């Protein structure tokens, strides 16, 4: 069980995959014994054994397997710990039924509230449920651990559903990834760490993978909502899945673009994040590295800013200050163009001959001020 007395903000939780595996294991125990337990010990992908509370357990039908039933139902409520996870308190539900026609097999299906994959690029079958590979294996492992006696004679069909999933998915990136109708069943370890960036990083990589299957050969990477809206207006010919909000995770987005064999990468951003990319940062979070104002002063000088302005830019702490000073001199477009060119120069050094690059720059109101390619 999770530690209830952990310091605030540090309490870990469990993934949708771990909770699904626990619910499935409990339901199979119900088929074996005739009664679904109130708690079940579940093996996580990371090797830990964890006890989950089980609700709404029931065994239905007669004339079934060892325990007499033909189907069983169990539900585990997800506890995300202190992580602000939109799937916290989701009801991960497993319905398991006997399949006399498929002895020894474990089949996995998605029910209501589990998304359906509609686009390639995710490593999942198009038309199938959005249950990722690690949770799939973990669910099957837990089913086999307690149901081997049944599996000697019959197969087991496990359907995972999430009653609130259709509503919860509106707060995720699933629609952009072509996962429709519900949430994804996720988790590589089974554990959710508070405020971890792992899930977002994974969604960035998946987004780029999907963009690589669209046939356009291009992905448009943005640093946030405003920049994405801006580049969508600049490139209306591209479908929505070609645009990926990479946030601070340039490294992962670019790595995925290389693996996907994309021919062109477009980056949309504002002066702050673009400066960090230009100076060689591949993770642009505010806490990872300071803005190189010396670089900004150099760029300002290259487009004609007087020495006193360059000194002021160098002595300030923000990229926004540099942009505003250059705008006031009437050199804003030239300055931001020089910055975009430096971004391309830096990325070409890191990713030589990998793809065509283009950078679009917008101001803090989302208006275009420069571009380079």
Swiss-Prot record:
GO MF: cobalt-precorrin-5B C1-methyltransferase activity
GO BP terms: anaerobic cobalamin biosynthetic process; methylation
Enzyme class: transferase
Keywords: Cobalamin biosynthesis, Methyltransferase, S-adenosyl-L-methionine, Transferase
Residue ranges crossing the lipid bilayer per the database entry: none
Stored InterPro entries: CbiD, CbiD_sf
Pfam family, one: CbiD
Enzymatic reactions: Co-precorrin-5B + S-adenosyl-L-methionine = Co-precorrin-6A + S-adenosyl-L-homocysteine
Pathway where this protein functions: Cofactor biosynthesis; adenosylcobalamin biosynthesis; cob(II)yrinate a,c-diamide from sirohydrochlorin (anaerobic route): step 6/10
Its EC number(s): 2.1.1.195
HAMAP family per record: CbiD (MF_00787)
NCBIfam families: cbiD, PRK00075.1-1
Family named by the database record: Belongs to the CbiD family.
Name of protein: Cobalt-precorrin-5B C(1)-methyltransferase
Lineage: Bacteria, Pseudomonadati, Pseudomonadota, Betaproteobacteria, Burkholderiales
């Amino acid at each position: 069980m999770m530690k209830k007395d952990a310091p605030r903000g540090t309490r870990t939780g469990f993934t949708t995959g771990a909770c699904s595996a626990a619910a499935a294991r409990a339901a199979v125990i119900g088929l074996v014994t005739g009664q679904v337990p109130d708690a079940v010990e579940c093996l996580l992908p990371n090797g830990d054994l964890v006890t989950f509370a089980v609700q709404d357990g029931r065994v239905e039908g007669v004339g079934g397997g060892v325990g007499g039933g033909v189907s069983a139902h169990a539900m585990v409520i997800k506890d995300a710990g202190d992580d602000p996870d939109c799937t916290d308190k989701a009801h991960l539900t497993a319905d398991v039924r006997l399949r006399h026609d498929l002895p020894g097999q474990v089949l996995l299906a998605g029910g209501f509230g589990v998304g359906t994959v509609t686009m390639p690029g995710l490593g999942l079958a198009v038309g199938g449920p959005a249950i990722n590979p690690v949770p799939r294996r973990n669910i099957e492992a837990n089913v086999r651990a307690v149901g081997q006696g049944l599996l000697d004679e019959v197969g087991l069909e496990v359907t995972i559903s999430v009653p609130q999933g259709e509503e919860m998915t509106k707060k995720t990136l699933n629609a952009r990834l072509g996962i429709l109708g519900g949430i994804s069943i996720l988790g590589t370890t089974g554990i959710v760490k508070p405020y971890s960036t792992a899930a977002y990083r994974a969604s960035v990589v998946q987004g780029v993978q999907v963009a690589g299957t669209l046939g356009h050969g291009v992905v448009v990477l943005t640093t946030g909502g405003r920049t994405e809206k801006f580049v969508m207006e600049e490139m209306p010919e591209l479908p929505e899945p070609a645009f990926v909000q990479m946030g601070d995770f340039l490294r992962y987005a670019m790595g995925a673009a290389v693996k996907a064999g994309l021919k062109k990468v477009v980056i949309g951003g504002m002066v702050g994040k673009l400066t960090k990319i230009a100076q060689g940062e591949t993770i642009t979070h505010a806490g990872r590295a300071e803005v190189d104002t010396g670089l900004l002063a150099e760029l300002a000088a290259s487009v004609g800013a007087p020495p006193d302005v360059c000194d002021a830019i160098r002595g300030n702490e923000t990229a926004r200050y540099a942009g505003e000073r250059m705008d006031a001199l009437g050199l804003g477009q030239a300055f931001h163009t020089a910055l975009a060119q430096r971004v391309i120069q830096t990325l070409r050094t890191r990713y030589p001959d990998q793809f065509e690059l283009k950078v679009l720059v917008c101001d803090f109101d989302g208006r275009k001020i420069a571009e380079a390619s």
